[in-house]
């Protein structure tokens, strides 16, 4: 590249000096001088999704939108991210606009509910003001808004049932995101907006599905995750979980349109062992011969459920396989065996009490 004229360089330096004097250090910089541009991430608690996102999780200092049909696992994924943030010593805020947060389920996923900051706002304006105040404090690592559809504007709540409020929620979201975007970036906080799907009337071609709250969130979000339940997981006659597929429909920090598939088990969340088996087979680290799964000389079991059970009972083998997968994708390695989930601990405690 040709060198810039020395007089131009001096003029730029003077202008940058004046800007920094007026607006503070770091308000303007040369991209090459900024060492902070390496994007940090917080894991989603799902190995396949971390790989699909390209940076090992959801990016810090960015807005993330998780959307999909009802009961597809949107809140579960958000709570897993909250649990991972808390494991790293981070603080998490949860704006429960739907008034539907289940603390015992959150505990089962590994969330420290004692230190989870929860707000159940009366209006959309109140919820977004609380979110902004928490982000502005600089002490919050993850803020979750569940959900955009439940952020009802004050005028709609105070009005009559049949009143028309066209575009009111879209304007509210647009204004809130304009205020939030800069603060989120400066404080390195992750803002996760959970959103619902609606159908556009009279669409002949293309998908009729759209998300609530206007277009602003689509523009401001660095990552958008489309969550779908694709199958039920059966054990005997009962259904014990869902098979879930996530498509990364927008990604500003890595290549988009990658997909992840995993199990969400009822009362347990994302199955870490199932994920390790699936990704291990895909990466040819775990060998599948007929119905048998094996890792090197170790036979994991006949059938996927038995292989999952073996990894649950032998966490050091699961850790070894996971770290090999992480190494292959340049993701940070796990340095210790994952602690037992709250559900497993509760199960053991109940068993001990019944034995007594």
Curated annotation (Swiss-Prot):
InterPro entries: AAA+_ATPase, DNA_recomb/repair_RecA, DNA_recomb/repair_RecA_CS, P-loop_NTPase, RecA-like_C, RecA-like_N, RecA_ATP-bd, RecA_C_sf
One GO CC annotation: cytosol
Chain positions recorded as ATP binding sites: 68-75
GO BP terms, alphabetized: DNA recombination; DNA repair; SOS response
Superkingdom, taxonomy of origin: Bacteria
Cytoplasm among keywords: yes
Pfam assignment, any one: RecA_C
SMART domains according to UniProt: AAA
Molecular function GO labels: ATP binding; ATP hydrolysis activity; ATP-dependent DNA damage sensor activity; damaged DNA binding; single-stranded DNA binding
Alphabetical keyword list: ATP-binding, Cytoplasm, DNA damage, DNA recombination, DNA repair, DNA-binding, Nucleotide-binding, SOS response
Claim: Nucleotide-binding is one of the keywords in the record: yes
Subcellular location: Cytoplasm
NCBIfam families: tigrfam_recA
Function: Can catalyze the hydrolysis of ATP in the presence of single-stranded DNA, the ATP-dependent uptake of single-stranded DNA by duplex DNA, and the ATP-dependent hybridization of homologous single-stranded DNAs. It interacts with LexA causing its activation and leading to its autocatalytic cleavage.
Family: Belongs to the RecA family.
Protein name: Protein RecA
């Amino acid at each position: 590249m040709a060198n810039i004229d020395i007089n131009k360089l001096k003029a730029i330096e003077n202008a940058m000096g004046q800007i920094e004097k007026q607006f503070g250090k770091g308000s303007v910089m040369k991209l090459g001088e900024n060492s902070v541009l390496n994007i940090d991430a917080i894991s989603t608690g799902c190995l396949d999704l971390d790989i699909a996102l390209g940076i090992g999780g959801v990016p810090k200092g960015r807005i993330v939108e998780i959307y999909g049909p009802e009961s597809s696992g949107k809140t579960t994924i958000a709570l897993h991210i909250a649990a991972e943030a808390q494991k790293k010593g981070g603080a998490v805020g949860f704006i429960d606009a739907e008034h539907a947060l289940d603390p015992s389920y959150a505990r089962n996923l590994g969330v420290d509910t004692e230190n989870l900051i929860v707000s159940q706002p009366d209006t959309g304006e109140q919820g977004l003001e609380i979110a902004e105040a928490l982000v502005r404090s600089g002490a919050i690592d993850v803020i979750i808004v569940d959900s955009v559809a439940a952020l009802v504007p004050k005028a709609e709540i105070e009005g009559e049932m049949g009143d028309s409020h066209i575009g009111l929620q879209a304007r509210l979201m647009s204004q809130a995101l304009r205020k939030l975007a800069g603060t989120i970036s400066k404080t390195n906080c992750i803002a996760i907006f959970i959103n619902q799907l609606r159908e556009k009337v009279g669409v002949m071609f293309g998908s009729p599905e759209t998300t609530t709250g206007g277009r602003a969130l689509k523009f401001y979000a660095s990552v958008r995750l489309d969550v779908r339940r694709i199958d039920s997981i059966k054990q005997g006659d009962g259904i014990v979980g869902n098979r879930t597929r996530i498509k990364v429909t927008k990604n500003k920090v890595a290549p988009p349109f990658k997909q992840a598939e995993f199990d969400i088990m009822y009362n347990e969340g994302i199955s870490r062992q199932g994920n390790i088996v699936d990704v291990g087979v895909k990466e040819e680290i775990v060998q599948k011969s007929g119905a048998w799964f094996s890792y090197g000389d170790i036979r994991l079991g006949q059938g996927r459920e038995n292989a999952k059970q073996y990894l649950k009972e032998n966490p050091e083998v699961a850790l070894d396989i996971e770290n090999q997968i992480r190494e292959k994708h340049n993701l940070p390695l796990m340095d210790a065996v994952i602690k037992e989930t709250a559900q497993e601990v509760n199960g053991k405690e109940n068993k001990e009490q019944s034995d007594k």
